[in-house]
Curated annotation (Swiss-Prot):
Record SUPFAM superfamilies: MFS general substrate transporter (SSF103473)
Phylogenetic classification of the source organism: Bacteria, Bacillati, Bacillota, Bacilli, Bacillales
UniProt keyword annotation of Electron transport present: no
Membrane-spanning intervals of the chain: 12-32, 38-58, 77-97, 102-122, 134-154, 158-178, 217-237, 239-259, 285-305, 309-329, 337-357, 363-383
Organism of derivation: Staphylococcus aureus (strain Mu50 / ATCC 700699)
Family as reported in the entry's similarity comment: Belongs to the major facilitator superfamily.
InterPro entries in the cross-refs: MFS, MFS_dom, MFS_Exporter, MFS_trans_sf
Gene: cntE
Descriptive protein name: Staphylopine export protein
């Protein structure tokens, strides 16, 4: 196999699956364990939120450091730190979980940037979007079984079993990760050590100065708000009104993400051009899904479950499309930091899906909250349509 499916890249995708397997378990186990330990929802929220907040803050730093040091060297250091963080889970309580979540957030920022930038730099231009899509696919696969494993461990009421599983994942991921490469020989990164027009702090201002980054970032934030609102509140929504099973809904969504990222990856543009009709078509799926979720009790369970497929398809296509586009149009100098800032937009959006939409649902109810989500997506659909197709600048090559 060639291109994004070549063996060196398949090893990277497998490493991605292994790396995110622990988090798929922890995302469910930590709240359950925290409740058993008598923690309030606020404390549990702080512990869980520390992961994504830390990842969001460190992504631009990660892009800059990777540009100077190289993705392989950074990856190997991060794998060791990640292993230490996972081992902490096996021997501590909630306070240790907080420290480990912060460490995991740092690791995730550097890990995802190392692999995505390494894939972008190593693949030919026509295969970039496919490579990023496959990375996203393998990062999602653990969500198919991780929650079930977490619930099983929690039901067993055996913290030693939890420690064994997490430490096993930590060690196998580290050992496997030390053997992966992006190519026969890691590219020389000395030419990337240039004087940056911004640093890891001032880079945040570039979000508003760079029109391409601003446009793509806003689209990613709004779409991620909907994704976050769905994953956070659909369980409460379905339980409170009793019209469907949230577990079935989220499983269907995860299957749709995995299937779409594999079977539709070749349809994702990878030419450095803006495709308004394509973006409107993809985002329209999310609008329909948001409205169906809002009227879930009225439309029935079957149609409600069908909306999970639309959400999964959108989730699978929006991120790699925008990442691939920005890899072409962003300026070469500082591109890695700017890509890190864009990826942080996805983190921010998902966190806002809970932090922002939670109070809104308290005020107006779940139905209107999801209607508002759909209206927000209509706004970014209009943005996508009005944005003129932009040819790839030669300076971005």
């Amino acid at each position: 196999m060639k291109g994004a499916m070549a063996w060196p890249f398949l090893r990277l995708y497998i490493l991605t699956l292994m790396f995110f397997s622990a988090n798929a378990i922890l995302n469910v186990f930590i709240p359950l364990r925290g409740h058993d330990l008598g923690a309030t929802n606020t404390v549990i929220g702080i512990v869980m939120g520390a992961y994504m907040l830390t990842a969001m803050v460190f992504r631009p730093w990660a892009g800059q450091i990777i540009a100077r040091v190289g993705p392989i060297k950074v990856l190997r250091i991060i794998l060791i730190i990640n292993a230490i963080a996972l081992i902490i889970y096996g021997f501590t309580g909630l306070e240790g979980y907080f420290v480990a979540r912060v460490m995991q957030g740092v690791c995730t920022a550097f890990f995802s940037m190392s692999l995505q930038l390494g894939i972008i730099d190593a693949l030919p231009e026509e295969h970039r979007s496919e490579g990023v899509s496959l990375y996203s696919l393998f990062s999602t696969i653990p969500n198919l079984i991780g929650p079930l494993v977490a619930v099983g461990i929690w039901n067993a009421n055996n913290i030693s079993l939890f420690a064994i599983v997490i430490i096993f994942i930590a060690l196998t991921t580290t050992f496997f990760g030390y053997r992966v490469t992006f190519a026969e020989q890691e590219p020389d990164t000395s030419d990337k050590i240039e004087k940056m027009p911004f640093n890891a702090v001032t880079v945040f201002a570039q979000f508003f100065k760079n029109k391409e980054l601003l446009n793509s970032g806003i689209i990613m934030i709004v779409a991620s708000i909907v994704f976050g609102a769905v994953s956070t509140f659909v369980p409460l929504y379905t339980v409170s009104l009793g019209f469907a099973n949230a577990g079935i809904f989220l499983t269907i969504q995860a299957i749709a993400v995995v299937a779409a990222r594999f079977y539709l990856r070749k349809y994702i543009p990878s030419d450095g051009m803006w495709h308004p009709k394509y973006m409107v078509s993809v985002l329209s799926l999310l609008v329909i899904a948001s409205f169906v979720v809002a009227f879930g009790p009225q439309v029935g369970a079957i149609i409600f479950y069908g909306s999970a497929i639309l959400i999964g398809m959108t989730q699978a296509m929006v991120y790699p499309t925008l990442t691939s586009y920005l890899s072409f149009v962003l300026p070469k100098v500082g591109r890695n930091m700017l890509l890190g800032l864009f990826i942080a937009c996805a983190d921010l959006g998902i966190s806002l899906g809970g932090a922002l939409m939670g109070p809104i649902s308290d005020l107006v109810g779940f139905k209107w909250m999801y209607l508002i989500c759909g209206m927000l997506v209509i706004v970014i659909m209009i943005m996508s349509f009005l944005k003129k197709p932009t040819p790839r600048p030669a300076s971005s090559l």
